[in-house]
UniProtKB/Swiss-Prot annotation:
Ranges of residues in domain TRAM: 398-463
CC cofactor: [4Fe-4S] cluster
Gene: rimO
Molecular function per GO: 4 iron, 4 sulfur cluster binding; aspartic acid methylthiotransferase activity; metal ion binding; protein methylthiotransferase activity
Top EC category: transferase
Cofactor annotation comment: Binds 2 [4Fe-4S] clusters. One cluster is coordinated with 3 cysteines and an exchangeable S-adenosyl-L-methionine.
Organism: Paracoccus denitrificans (strain Pd 1222)
Domain MTTase N-terminal: 30-140
Function: Catalyzes the methylthiolation of an aspartic acid residue of ribosomal protein uS12.
Assigned keywords, A-Z: 4Fe-4S, Cytoplasm, Iron, Iron-sulfur, Metal-binding, S-adenosyl-L-methionine, Transferase
Protein name: Ribosomal protein uS12 methylthiotransferase RimO
Length: 463
């Protein structure tokens, strides 16, 4: 059997060297092959993919015959490079039959599948997770005593009972105060089945709460045209419903107030066929309320519409908790515009609020806007805003006194148990404290408590 093709020597002057693989393996170990084409940057991508696969227990095969499947990391820089990539894919299909395509030419999936419709998967450049997921599907990993030292959930920097679940990278918006699109690019959504697979592994490892994050959660799947792959549709409503079936709390963050967010609310309501699958909690970055400020920010929302949306959400799910963040002192913000924000907050009655004083960020377009607000004025507006937000929070928490609610335990020490309600995300929201009868509790426990006391941001209760 022929060895797998390597880079021809004269394709381009910036060509990467032919990869050298460590091909040692144990009996029964799953194997994968790699054909790496193109420039040194592509070679680094191949190295990263192979590093992840080796860490998961895969061996690297030096030839087609010994590989359970073959990854072809393509180049699409020139027409000649595209032709070489198609040729390499065809060779891998002929010699092995199971081929996963990635790399620059993967950004044109129809071009590849038009020539080779039998490839298992096509992913774009730097889409490492999608490549790994395709490998797992084609060549399932097997247990290895050394690999098993790594927790099933991976290396996490959060407590074992909750985990952040990233569903996409990048953002399609062009907010003038933000440089995220410049740093992370346009929206790139993970396949829904890959998200679900990660979530399943987390829950199996003991995670009780999944915190769904991205730059724009409600836009999830837009770049994938909301496609259905392996039984899961890449749309936030479908994804939330699927995640809600796993038995863990599901909390949604960074949700822009698009009209289709209304479809999420029935999943949060206590009643209905799909009710209770998702926590009644939405983290929505409104940023401001005055239409002129929003326009200067280049934000994709208007204050009047958001009030209508809030009313519609609460009509379906009266217990919904709404969290948001705001910027005061944005360039050009007048006292009248700020007062509009205060009036809007009075009407919106948000449960959880964060506020930032505007600061220039290197590379942000807002830096060049006229009429920057003096620091002392920004501080005064922040103080007034937070005073109003605090009063709203205190009143809403006071209304919970005497009620029986469900909480998740975050920590237990000699003084008591620190918990969170369904209305509280870790780190950014409040807590519920239990001072008596907590000795048998452990982090990750979900228990019912009676609320005895309320403060500005926190609650106290008893089992």
């Amino acid at each position: 059997m022929p060895a797998m093709s390597q880079n021809p020597p004269l394709l381009r002057p910036d060509l990467a060297p032919a990869p050298i693989f460590d091909t040692s393996r144990r009996e029964g170990q799953p194997t994968i092959g790699m054909v790496s084409l193109g420039c040194p940057k592509a070679l680094v991508d191949s190295e990263r993919i192979l590093t992840r696969l080796r860490a998961e227990g895969y061996a690297i095969s030096p030839d087609y015959k010994g590989a359970g499947a073959v990854i072809v990391n393509t180049c699409g820089f020139l027409d000649s490079a595209k032709a070489e990539s198609l040729q390499a894919i065809g060779e891998a299909l002929a010699e092995n039959g199971k081929v996963i395509v990635t790399g620059c030419l993967g950004a044109e999936p129809e071009y590849i599948t038009g020539a080779h419709p039998s490839v298992l998967a096509v992913t774009g450049p730097q889409q490492y997770e999608q490549v790994l997921d395709a490998v797992h599907h084609a060549v399932p990993p097997s247990p290895d005593p050394f690999v098993d030292l790594l927790p099933a959930s991976g290396v996490k920097l959060t407590p074992r009972h909750y985990s952040y679940l990233k569903i996409s990278e990048g953002c399609n918006h062009a907010c003038k105060f933000c440089i995220i699109p410049d740093m992370r690019g346009k929206l790139v959504s993970r396949p829904a089945h890959a998200v679900i697979r990660e979530a399943e592994k987390l829950v199996e490892a003991g995670v009780r709460e999944l915190l769904v994050i991205s730059q724009d959660t409600s836009a999830y799947g837009l770049d994938r045209k909301f496609a259905t792959e392996r039984g899961h549709r890449a749309h936030i409503t479908d994804l939330a419903r699927d995640l809600g079936q796993l038995g863990a709390w599901v909390r949604l963050h960074y949700v822009y107030p698009y009209p289709h967010v209304r479809d999420l609310i029935p999943l949060m309501a206590a009643h209905g066929e799909s009710g209770g699958l998702v926590l009644p909690y939405l983290d929505i970055p409104f940023q401001h309320a005055h239409p002129d400020v929003l326009k200067r920010m280049a934000r994709p929302a208007a204050a009047a519409r958001t009030l209508d949306e809030i009313a519609a959400w609460r009509a379906v799910c009266p217990d919904i908790t709404l969290r948001s963040t705001f910027i005061v002192g944005y360039p050009g913000e007048t006292e009248a515009e700020f007062q509009t924000l205060l009036d809007w907050l009075d009407e919106a009655q948000l449960d959880r609020v964060g506020c930032f004083q505007y600061e220039n960020v290197k590379g942000a377009r807002a830096n060049d806007l006229p009429d920057h607000v003096p620091d002392d004025v920004k501080q005064d507006r922040w103080d007034r805003f937070m005073q109003k937000a605090q009063a709203i929070s205190e009143a809403k928490l006071a209304a919970k006194v005497g009620h029986r609610i469900e909480v998740i335990v975050d920590a237990v020490d000699g003084d008591g148990a620190t918990c969170r309600t369904k209305a509280d995300a870790p780190e950014i929201d409040g807590n519920l404290f239990i001072d008596e009868g907590f000795e048998d509790l452990a982090p990750g426990d979900i228990v019912s408590v009676t609320v005895d006391e309320a403060g500005e941001y926190d609650l106290w209760g008893r089992l």
